[in-house]
Amino acid sequence: MMPHSGVLLDVTTPLLDGLQRIAQRQPRPQPFVDLGSLPWDDPGFSQHFLRTATRSQRHTQREMTCLEQWGLLRPGQRILDIACGGGRHSLAMARRGAVVTGIDLGPAAISAAQQRARKAGLQVEFVQGDVRSMDYEAAFDAVTFIFGCFTEMTRQDATEVLRRVSRSLRPGGMFVLDVYAPDFFAMLDGEQEWWVGRDFIAGRFPQLVLTEYFYYSDTKMYARRDFICDARTGAVHTFGVSGQSYALPELCDMLTEAGMQPAMVYGNWRGEDVTAESTMYLVLAAKAPETP
């Protein structure tokens, strides 16, 4: 028996067969070639991910406090929340009087966000769609991409998203983006985590999970793989994430090229400065105001 967090698995022949298949995996996958991205638009995956990936109200409160202090969250402010998920940020901003549109690729996430908005009596427009093809023009006072998947895109896609964000902002509008720094992914390189559970992104069943992390310093790309072995049948479900991280000057250059000028940069949501030890960047960028 293998215990983890109170979960016990019988060591059966199917489980051992599944582990053998995991042992034969490719040593180091090539990002965006051997691994793509998570199937966000798959209804089943969307439901499983939504159920297992949530953040605390404490995080949300801190983020909203920062947005208010920066003058970006005021009654009547038109805000686009990119990768809105189940509406954590969208609903919090709507409660503070903002006029919010949330966009996400996951059908279960959008459905859950709509239900939560109705239950709370809040008017929020939730759109199931791909941020890489969104088409708004000068429609928002602010755009947020918080706890999203900006780095889980190719550089080409990320450049296109920034262009579309800039187009969606009114002149003088603000963009808020948080991303993990390359050093965050570098620290994870080679890490492996084995754990036993009953509920993860492949569904609800007794399972043994291996999560692996990879980082490639020459390109600043990263990858994560999850092998989820069904303890009952030995079936192995594999999920992969590829990503492209950016040094801070590089990210600021991308924003500038898209038509947004970085105005403030922090090392976290506590408003601390970026240091050599920072594992994330929080960037506020402004679209140029209209010229007389």
Range-by-range predicted roles:
Residues 242-292:
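C-terminal lobe and adjacent flexible extensions of AdoMet/dcAdoMet transferase-like proteins
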Residues 132-142:
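A short acidic, Gly/Pro-enriched loop at the edge of an enzyme's catalytic core
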Residues 172-179:
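Conserved beta-strand signature within the Rossmann-like core of class I S-adenosyl-L-methionine
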Residues 6-77:
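Conserved class I S-adenosyl-L-methionine
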Residues 179-252:
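SAM-dependent methyltransferase
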Residues 83-87:
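Class I SAM-dependent methyltransferase "Motif I" SAM/SAH-binding loop
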Residues 159-171:
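A short glycine-rich, Lys/Arg-flanked "PGG" loop and its adjoining helix->strand segment in the class I
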Residues 88-133:
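Class I SAM-dependent methyltransferase SAM/SAH-binding core
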